A protein has these predicted regions:
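Acidic/Ser-Thr/Pro-Gly-rich, low-complexity N-terminal segments
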Residues: 1-33
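Alpha-helical transmembrane segments forming the membrane-embedded cores
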Residues: 259, 263-306
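Short acidic-aromatic active-site loops that bind/stabilize oxyanions
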Residues: 256
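Cytosolic-side transmembrane helix boundary signature
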Residues: 28-45, 266-271
Length: 306
C-alpha cells in the first residue's frame, strides 16, 4: 500500500546578494553639555585684584627700600652744594627756598653723622633729609629752632631719636659756624616740652614704624652764645606742621596714574601687534619711571614724619 504524499509549503526564495540592508534607526541627538560658569568677569576681577596687590607691594618696597636710595642721592647732592657754600661763606643764615640745604647735623649717640638739613618740613622736603621748620630760627640763633625728621621711610634719619639720653651732644653747622647742644628733656604729642631756656633745639619725629599718630620730641640747650638771627621768619602752612600730609600731591598723583595707565595700555596693544618681548622691553623703562612718580606722590600724602 502506498503512503499518500504530503503537501510541503513552498520554500522561500533565496535572498539576492544585491539586496539593500534595512537602514538602522537614527540615534537621538546628544543632549547639550551643561553651561559652565562664565569665566570672563571672574578672570577680570582676579586680574584686577592681583594688579592692585602688586601695586601695594611695590609701594611698600618703595617706602622701605627704594626711598632710602632716593634720600641718599639727595643727601649727596645737597652735601656737595652746602660744602661749597660754607667754603665761600654763602650758606643761608635766614629764610631761603624750600628744599635748599642750610645746615649739617651730627648726633654721635645715634650714629647720625654729616646729615644735611634742608629748609621746610612738608612731606616733599623731608624726602631729602631732616627739615627745618621755616617759622623758627636757624640752629645757633637766639630762640627755639625746630627740626623734623622721618622715622621710617626715606632714610629714616630720626628713627633712633628715642634712644637719646640726657647729656648727649648734638652738633649743628650752619653758615654762622658750628653750634653744640646738650640734650636735656623729652616730650611727645601729649606732653610738649616745657623747657624755658631761651636758646634751644627741638627734634621731632613720628612715634611709630607704621603710620604715626603722635610724635617723639627731644629738647636740647645751646652751649655757648648764639649768633644774631637773620631776617624775619615766614609763616607756616598746613603742610608744614607735624604729621601733615601734602595734599597738593593729589593732583600730580592722579596725572601720573593716568599716564601710567595709558603707558600700560599702549604696551599691551603693541604686544598684540608686534613682537611681545620687544614691546615689553621698550615699554619697561617708561612704565618704571611713571610708577616711581606715582609712588613718590603717593608717599607725599602720608604723614610728613613717617
Amino acid at each position: 500500500m502506498t503512503a499518500p504524499a504530503l503537501d510541503r509549503p513552498p520554500a522561500d526564495p533565496p535572498a539576492s546578494a544585491s539586496a539593500t540592508p534595512a537602514p538602522e534607526p537614527a540615534s537621538a541627538p546628544a543632549p547639550p553639555a551643561p553651561a559652565g560658569p562664565r569665566r570672563g568677569p571672574l578672570l577680570v576681577a582676579a586680574r584686577a585684584v592681583t594688579l592692585a596687590a602688586g601695586l601695594l607691594l611695590g609701594f611698600a618696597g618703595y617706602l622701605l627700600g627704594l626711598s632710602d636710595l632716593q634720600e641718599a642721592h639727595h643727601q649727596s647732592t645737597a652735601y656737595a652744594t652746602l660744602r661749597d657754600r660754607l667754603a665761600n661763606a654763602t650758606a643761608p643764615t635766614g629764610p631761603t627756598e624750600d628744599g635748599a640745604p642750610l645746615a649739617v647735623l651730627d648726633i654721635p649717640a645715634i650714629d647720625l653723622r654729616q646729615v644735611v638739613v634742608v629748609e621746610g618740613t612738608t612731606g616733599r622736603d623731608l624726602m631729602r633729609g631732616p627739615g627745618h621748620r621755616r617759622d623758627t630760627v636757624l640752629p645757633g640763633q637766639p630762640g627755639v629752632a625746630v627740626l623734623f625728621g622721618r622715622s621710617t621711610a626715606f632714610g629714616a634719619p630720626f628713627a633712633d631719636l628715642g634712644r637719646l639720653k640726657v647729656g648727649d651732644r648734638i652738633d649743628v653747622t650752619t653758615g654762622q659756624g658750628t653750634f653744640h647742644y646738650t640734650v636735656n628733656t623729652y616730650g611727645d604729642g601729649d606732653h610738649p616740652i616745657k623747657d624755658t631756656a631761651p636758646d634751644r633745639l627741638v627734634l621731632v619725629t613720628g612715634d611709630s614704624d607704621w603710620i604715626p599718630t603722635s610724635t617723639v620730641l627731644v629738647g636740647a640747650r645751646l652751649d655757648g652764645d648764639p649768633e644774631p638771627a637773620g631776617a624775619k621768619r615766614p609763616a607756616t602752612t598746613a603742610t608744614d606742621k607735624v604729621l601733615a600730609a601734602d595734599k597738593g600731591a593729589l593732583p600730580a598723583l592722579q596725572l601720573w596714574s593716568l599716564a601710567l595707565l595709558l603707558a600700560v595700555t599702549a604696551a599691551a596693544v603693541a604686544a598684540r601687534r608686534w613682537q611681545r618681548t620687544a614691546a615689553y622691553l621698550c615699554a619697561a623703562p617708561v612704565v618704571a619711571a611713571l610708577l616711581w612718580s606715582v609712588y613718590e606722590n603717593a608717599a607725599a600724602l602720608l604723614p610728613n614724619v613717617y
